């Protein structure tokens, strides 16, 4: 699955799950709450050791906070220890996420960026630290809870999971342990035709129907 196709999928999930007006109401409200935390006595809680860590030189389409969020999500969502699966550390997961997000239109990318910031910061209320600083079990439990939460929570969880999973599995190095030998569309040289329209019912001429 190429990054452009995946970007279209992400945009559709985002737009279906969170209408623009709802996002402005919920998302910006949540960001405002997180900002209030930073301005108040809990400012120290929002700080993270990750804030002091440098990002790789190739990180140009993600903020530092987004890079650390997806790098943490990679570890949390792809626990392969004790399995024959390839360690996500050996796969350019976050780089692939960056590529996918680069195909989003500016408005959707901006909204999603605010949503990612909300996801990282809002757990300060319940855990006293950001998502990137949660223990693995806590972070997985957060994904489980948000997966059954509000529309905004479910949408953000779905988007993050799909970005991380697709970024991992699109790399051929991850396929051999599952005995997957690649998409048949590539092996057979099939051209991607985009989203085909649904078949239409044939129209019946009124005179023909009366006859």
Language-model features and meaning:
Residues 15, 19, 32, 61-65:
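Short, contiguous, pocket-lining structural segments
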Residues 44-59:
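Ser/Thr/Pro/Gly-rich low-complexity linker/stalk segments immediately outside membranes or between
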Residues 56-58, 63-170:
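Flexible, low-complexity segments enriched for small/polar residues
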Residues 150-211:
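Long, amphipathic alpha-helical surface segments
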Residues 1-18:
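N-terminal secretory signal peptides
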Residues 18-45, 135:
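N-terminal export leaders
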Residues 6-7, 51-52, 121-123:
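Short hydrophobic/aromatic segments of transmembrane alpha-helices and their interfaces
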